[in-house]
């Protein structure tokens, strides 16, 4: 793999002077270095984590021609150049192919290979993340995080300088505390080099979610826990630590660190306030965790054995050499707060109004008289006009509702079957009654953006943002621009996912 220049780093203390002579506040990895526990891996799609870093943050690949480009900070130590991504990806889709390591060690994260579990992509690889699934702003500047859907994962099984055996290390990640599930396992950190489960104590990674198969904290979750392999741990007990609270800050700082027979969990609101310690003590009281047998691979969004059931959103994170002090981590947290993470719009293009009734017309040349409709639970396209029957007009009419899982997006309720919504199931769109579950809410939430073919809107799945409303043989799917399903075919994709929205027929 050819990698670009620019991976040099500057080690500074409280402040760094960059080439222009401008005084720049220390980044997280500068702070860790000054504390004697330097970063050995530093990953972020949103910003530079060293004050002098000007190299690439991540790479995107576009669907139109397979070309790639690297996205760098706007300036040394700065926020990602999201405008460069937006320009490169205009009128097509983009995936995040590489998350570069800013530490200089080359510990880049790429598409995770198959392991104990296979991913959904060709040859058992995991999916890559959409480049636009997690927009944010940092100090008012737009950037994109990494939105992990089940099946998506990144990995490096040949990392350099990461902790092995019982060696000390620390790690933090900034996550979306509202995006999680109970699947295994949304992790960031140290894992097996074989992508298989090699036994207790062979991992040390941050976990976030509400899985209760192993450990848990207080309340109903989600929790920050440590994935130490064959267990998600909230403390010394293999089960519950009441001191590990449920946390759902929109921006969440999560910390795990470990050294011989001592480890800790810490957390905070990444937008304000200071860190709290949720656990600090001995290793779990089960065999295999003291001493640890860490292997030093790096994972994001998956379990050590490539378990792919989890979801979450990652903005930035690092791994260190040595066990960071609380004081060092407190300074890192202050830096994260100063970055001023904030939400950004999830939609673009023609606006929708909650409570309005709409119809959606296909724009593919074959099908411009066809509208998105349903026949029972099947969502399809049908030829509809002003002279159509009242029943057909109603089948092709939809009420716009606030997104059931995220009110920044939308859900679409059937006009003739109130209480039933368009949702995806196995990536087939269907009309289903709202059963009130978190899964239904997520599967029925969609985010319109400017139409990929320049007409109307393309309607993106909120929880699988690589996937869009697509008509294929007149049936509706949540389809990606290329993939393993027949309905993911790249031919006419932009046309098939672009819809002109109008006032409803009924």
Swiss-Prot record:
**One Pfam family name from the record?**
ArabFuran-catal
Subcellular localization(s) per the UniProt record: Secreted
Q: State the coiled-coil residue ranges.
A: none
Under which EC number(s) is this enzyme classified? 3.2.1.55
In the UniProt record, the signal sequence range is 1-26
Q: In which pathway does it act?
A: Glycan metabolism; L-arabinan degradation
Where do the segments described as Catalytic lie? 27-343
Spell out the residues of the site Cis-peptide bond.
184-185
Q: Which keywords appear in this protein's UniProt record, sorted alphabetically?
A: Carbohydrate metabolism, Disulfide bond, Glycoprotein, Glycosidase, Hydrolase, Polysaccharide degradation, Secreted, Signal, Xylan degradation
Instruction: Quote the record's binding site residues for substrate.
Output: 227, 230, 304, 424, 427, 443, 471, 476, 496
Active site feature:
229 (nucleophile), 305 (proton donor)
Region annotation ABD: where it falls in the sequence:
344-506
Q: Does the keyword Hydrolase apply?
A: yes
Q: Which GO terms describe its cellular component?
A: extracellular region
Family annotation (CDD domains): beta-trefoil_ABD_ABFB
A single GO molecular-function term is: alpha-L-arabinofuranosidase activity
What is this protein's function?
Alpha-L-arabinofuranosidase involved in the degradation of arabinoxylan, a major component of plant hemicellulose. Able to hydrolyze 1,5-, 1,3- and 1,2-alpha-linkages not only in L-arabinofuranosyl oligosaccharides, but also in polysaccharides containing terminal non-reducing L-arabinofuranoses in side chains, like L-arabinan, arabinogalactan and arabinoxylan.
Q: What is this protein called?
A: Probable alpha-L-arabinofuranosidase B
Organism lineage: Eukaryota, Fungi, Dikarya, Ascomycota, Pezizomycotina
């Amino acid at each position: 793999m050819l990698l670009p220049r620019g991976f040099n780093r500057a080690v500074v203390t409280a402040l760094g002077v960059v080439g222009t002579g401008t005084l720049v506040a220390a980044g997280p990895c500068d702070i860790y270095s000054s504390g004697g526990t330097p970063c050995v891996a530093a990953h972020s799609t949103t910003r530079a984590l060293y004050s002098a870093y000007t190299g690439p943050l991540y790479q995107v690949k576009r669907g139109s021609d397979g070309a790639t480009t690297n996205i760098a900070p706007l300036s040394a130590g700065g926020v990602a150049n999201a405008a460069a991504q937006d320009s490169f990806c205009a009128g097509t889709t983009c995936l995040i192919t590489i998350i570069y390591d800013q530490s200089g060690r080359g510990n880049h994260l790429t598409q995770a290979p198959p392991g104990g579990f296979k991913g959904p992509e060709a040859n058992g690889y995991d999916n890559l993340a959409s480049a636009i699934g997690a927009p944010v702003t940092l100090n008012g500047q737009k950037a994109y995080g990494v939105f992990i859907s089940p099946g998506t994962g990144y990995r490096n099984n040949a990392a350099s300088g990461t902790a092995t055996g019982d060696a000390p290390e620390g790690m933090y990640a900034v996550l979306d505390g509202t995006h999680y599930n109970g699947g295994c396992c949304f992790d960031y950190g140290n894992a097996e080099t074989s992508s298989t489960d090699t036994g207790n104590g062979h991992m040390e990674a941050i976990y976030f979610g509400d899985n209760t198969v192993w450990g848990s904290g207080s309340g109903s979750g989600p929790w920050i826990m440590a994935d130490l392999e064959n267990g998600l741990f909230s403390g010394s007990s293999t089960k519950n630590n009441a001191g590990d609270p449920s946390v759902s800050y929109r921006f969440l700082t999560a910390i795990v660190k470990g050294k011989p027979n001592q480890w800790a969990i810490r957390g905070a609101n990444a937008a304000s306030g200071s860190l709290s310690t949720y656990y600090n003590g001995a290793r779990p009281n089960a065999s295999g965790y003291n001493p640890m047998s860490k292997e030093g691979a790096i994972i994001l969004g998956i379990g050590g054995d490539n378990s792919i059931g989890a979801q979450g959103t990652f903005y930035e994170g690092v791994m260190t050499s040595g066990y960071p002090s609380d004081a060092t981590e407190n300074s890192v947290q202050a830096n994260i707060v100063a970055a001023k993470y904030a939400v950004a719009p999830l939609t673009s293009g023609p606006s929708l109004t909650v409570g309005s009734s709409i119809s959606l017309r296909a724009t593919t040349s074959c099908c411009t008289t066809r509208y998105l409709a349903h026949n029972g639970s099947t969502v399809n396209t049908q030829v509809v006009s002003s002279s159509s029957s009242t029943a057909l007009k109603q089948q092709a009419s939809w009420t716009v509702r606030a997104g059931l899982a995220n009110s920044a997006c939308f859900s679409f309720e059937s006009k003739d079957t109130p209480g039933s919504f368009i949702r995806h199931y196995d990536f087939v769109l269907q009309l289903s009654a709202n059963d009130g579950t978190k899964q239904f809410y997520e599967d029925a939430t969609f985010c319109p953006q400017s139409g990929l073919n320049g007409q109307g809107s393309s309607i993106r799945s909120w929880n699988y943002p690589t996937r869009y409303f697509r008509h294929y043989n007149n049936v509706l799917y949540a389809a990606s621009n290329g993939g393993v399903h027949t309905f993911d075919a790249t031919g006419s994709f932009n046309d098939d996912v672009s819809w002109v929205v109008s006032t409803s027929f009924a």
